[in-house]
From Swiss-Prot:
The lineage of its organism: Eukaryota, Metazoa, Chordata, Craniata, Vertebrata. Its main location: membrane. The gene is TMEM102. One of its GO terms (cellular component) is cell surface. Residues 1-267 are extracellular. Selectively involved in CSF2 deprivation-induced apoptosis via a mitochondria-dependent pathway. It is a single-pass membrane protein. Keywords: Apoptosis, Cell membrane, Membrane, Transmembrane, Transmembrane helix. Residues 168-258 are annotated as: Disordered. One of its GO terms (biological process) is apoptotic process. This is Transmembrane protein 102.
Length: 512
């Protein structure tokens, strides 16, 4: 009897196997299905969307206004603080990679156990034109020095900042100046720029001359925070922060520029915290307004925690960092990206109190270059699936770096920019590739931790440092990489808890 056939095979043979699924559907390292990872990443994005929408909720707006009111009170107390200034508000705290401060002690705060959402606020206390002699950039590092002459426009700047002066610029270095500044010198008391924000564009730039509407100050500010249920404000001491000290009178104006004293970032950070603490101690709670429950200084910035009235009650973290705003663009800095030109007629950058991320720290008077404004513009051009992948990788990394000096969160953010330079935009924009992109970012971060350096995205030839904790973090990252699906499920549950608000441990009990 003739045998029937199934295709080219006898009828008794098993059917041919189904076409193999692409190898990219399975993660080789962990065996996880990329489709499942992508679904978890998308779910994580939905759960975290309460603080990521185009129209922030009233709790976030109230907290923002509360912080702006605090700053206006600082100006009333100390005229050195500019009455009008641009405030750049970034979503995510410094511990989540919003800024590069290098490996620095950032405190024990962890999103979830200690707060629901974090933000970074850049507060310019000084503004200058980068073409002047005051700014000195080191060609061999990411640092700069701000040298103060005796007078600027008839104002004794050096006398005004006497308690924040540092030694002259160290010798033996090659210096460059920013270029392409289209503006004249700007007085730090009269700088008013266009609004920029990562939360709500039209309202992020506020005049600090406005009367605060949700902060009350008693006529006799004798009340201490402890007396009204707030923990005392604390100041961490570490090797990266120096206390304000008596400074000898500066050189005469006729002396060479090399002898000019510098504006010390650590001293400025100490002054900023002391001013905020003095204002905070004079406050008393206002019904229906956010409540300041904690403030402390870490490295070069101040961290405050605000409890919103709710419902739901949320605890919001704000990292307030005093910065110098510089008009112009540094020579040798990247001028183009995958998204187009970076340097334009209105280009500017910031100087921030660095955490000592270089192998050889240039001294306590060195400010670190920061391109937060350009990073904000780049973020708007990154495909949404890649942003979701980065947010997921960031959530997985969060518990691993809590309480450490690791610079991994900002390294992960920089890898995001390099990925856009390297990979096709069509690939990054496909939603089904979010899982693969998340794993790719984690794998790249592992290689960076092993090498301990990563090329700086904006400054050619410069390196970002991973810090001393890179080895231990690399081991923890390898364990996480073995089961990314489980870690993502835990991150989703954490995001659900944060969405509900409240139930946060260790806040308001003086434990920070």
């Amino acid at each position: 009897m003739a045998s029937a056939v199934w295709g080219n095979a006898p009828w008794w043979s098993p059917p041919p196997p189904a076409p193999a699924r692409p190898l990219t559907d399975i993660d080789f390292c962990s065996g996880a299905q990329l489709q499942e990872l992508t679904q978890l990443i998308q779910e994580l994005g939905v759960q975290e969307s309460w603080n990521d929408g185009p129209k922030p909720g009233p709790d976030l707006l109230q907290a923002k206004d509360f912080v702006f009111s605090l700053l206006s009170l600082i100006h009333r107390r100390d005229p050195r603080f500019p009455p009008q200034t641009e405030l750049l508000l970034l979503r995510g705290g410094i511990r989540e990679g919003s800024l590069d401060l290098g490996p620095a002690p950032l405190g024990p705060y962890t999103r979830g156990p200690h707060y629901d959402a974090g933000f970074t606020l850049l507060v310019p206390v000084f503004s200058l034109d980068g073409t002047g002699q005051e700014l000195q950039l080191d060609m061999r590092s990411c640092y700069a020095w701000l040298c103060l002459p005796e007078q600027v426009r008839g104002t004794s700047v050096r006398e005004a900042w006497q308690d924040c002066l540092g030694p002259p610029v160290p010798g033996g270095r090659d210096w460059i100046h920013p270029t392409d500044s289209r503006e004249g010198p700007r007085d730090p008391q009269s700088s008013v720029d266009q609004p920029h924000s990562d939360i709500i564009e039209p309202e992020a730039h506020e005049s600090l001359e406005k009367s605060p509407s949700n902060v009350s100050v008693p006529e006799s500010p004798q009340q201490n925070l402890t007396d009204i249920g707030f923990p005392s404000l604390s100041e961490e001491t570490n090797d990266d922060v120096t206390k304000a000290a008596d400074v000898s009178p500066g050189p005469q104006p006729s002396e060479a520029r090399e002898a000019w004293p510098t504006l010390c970032p650590a001293q400025v950070a100490a002054w900023f915290f002391a001013s905020l603490a003095a204002v905070a101690e004079s406050l008393f709670p206002v019904p229906g307004a956010p409540r300041l429950v904690h403030a402390a200084r870490h490295a070069g910035f101040t961290t405050i925690l605000l409890a919103t009235p709710g419902p739901p009650r949320r605890l919001l973290l704000f990292d307030l960092i005093p910065v110098v705003s510089v008009a112009g663009w540094p020579q040798g800095a990247r001028s183009h990206s995958w998204a187009g030109p970076l340097a334009s007629e209105s280009s500017s950058f910031y100087l921030v109190p660095g955490g000592g991320g270089q192998t050889e720290r240039p001294g306590a008077s060195g400010w670190q270059l920061c391109f937060a404004r350009q990073e904000l513009a780049l973020k708007a051009r990154i495909p949404t699936p890649l942003l979701q992948a980065h947010a997921a990788a960031q959530a997985l990394l969060r518990p691993l770096v809590a309480g450490t000096r690791a610079a991994a969160p900002y390294l992960l953010r920089t890898l995001l920019y390099w990925a856009c330079e390297r990979l096709p935009a069509l690939y990054l924009a496909r939603p089904e590739n979010a899982g693969a992109c998340c794993l790719g970012l984690l794998d790249e971060l592992g290689r960076v931790l092993e090498a301990r350096t990563l090329p700086h995205y904006f400054l050619s030839g410069q390196k970002l440092r991973a810090g001393d904790g890179a080895s231990s973090l690399l081991g923890a990252l390898a364990l996480l990489r073995g089961d990314p699906a489980r870690a993502l499920r835990a991150a989703v549950e954490e995001a659900k808890a944060a969405r509900k608000g409240g139930g946060l441990a260790g806040v308001g009990a003086g434990s920070h």
